[in-house]
Amino acid sequence: MEAHRLNSTWEIVKLPPGQRAIGSRWFMKVKTNADGSLDCYKARMVAKGYSQCPGFDFKETFAPTVRYSTIWIILAIATLEDLELCSLDISHAYLNGKLEEEIYMRQPEGFKVGGPDYVCRLKKSLYGLKQAGWVWNKKLHSVLLSMGFERTQSDHGLYIFQRDNIHIFLPVFVDDLTLAGKKGTNFDPFIEELSSHFKLCDLGPTTQLLGLEIHRDCTNLTLSISQRQFITNLLQDHGVQDCKPISTPLNPGCCLSTSMCPQTEAEALEMRQYPYISIVGSLMYLALTARPDIAYAARVLARFNSNPGPTHWQAAKHVLQYLKGTLDHKLVYKAFQLI
């Protein structure tokens, strides 16, 4: 709430006749570091944007974010050219954008000012609003352009700075920014300029990027990408952290088919108690980011998302057992192999 007060996110006013106020709620989150250790507890007040009306209190909603394919290319270039990587985090990012629409919101639970007719008239964007991402991206885009960065046409989540023999890549994912430049590049002027516009946290050399764990060996010029912590959390969430490790994603000769799907409503109802779709979604994410070795298994399992049977469920658990035994598998970039 102190952040909202300092930011002048809203002002308390009496709800005008004919206007309606959307709701608000508290969202609690435990933030962890790359190794799974506790970073901090976060309490975020969000607007109930699902009650907004299109064309009335919001118009645009789209906000670009950097693609994983772009990240892989940048990491490959960083390995080949021995670039320095520096991570930045913008605190309370969505609170920086100014709203164009007139939006009223009921006061947060536990913080009441005035009578029952008094509400918050939003002056700045807020988490939960339909247009929050678009408003924030518009603000960040204008700041980066003023600093001399240019947005690439191939990926609107990637900015490039080229001036006075200084070349910097800047991939943007909402409020997470990464600076990539040649060794010896002084990032301080860029960080100071960003700090004059936003509350910024300099996280130092990049060890985590879009959930990917980054490990660098500057002596041997290698960079590796892993998802150990994500896999550990996945196993714990589904209660199989102590499962027996196995060596293959699917059983040799495994052939899943629709004939193994439930044939009656009772059988389908029985299968709904298992988090099949949740697990397959996590496997698809892993296959896309850092574990291509499970791509085939994840794709096969995804074919039966609408009506999985017991055999499909056992196959999904089989992949989890494989991940248990391959926690430390990494994608490794080697500079001499990229030439």
Language model features: what each stretch is:
Residues 1-339:
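Long, low-complexity, charge-biased intrinsically disordered regions
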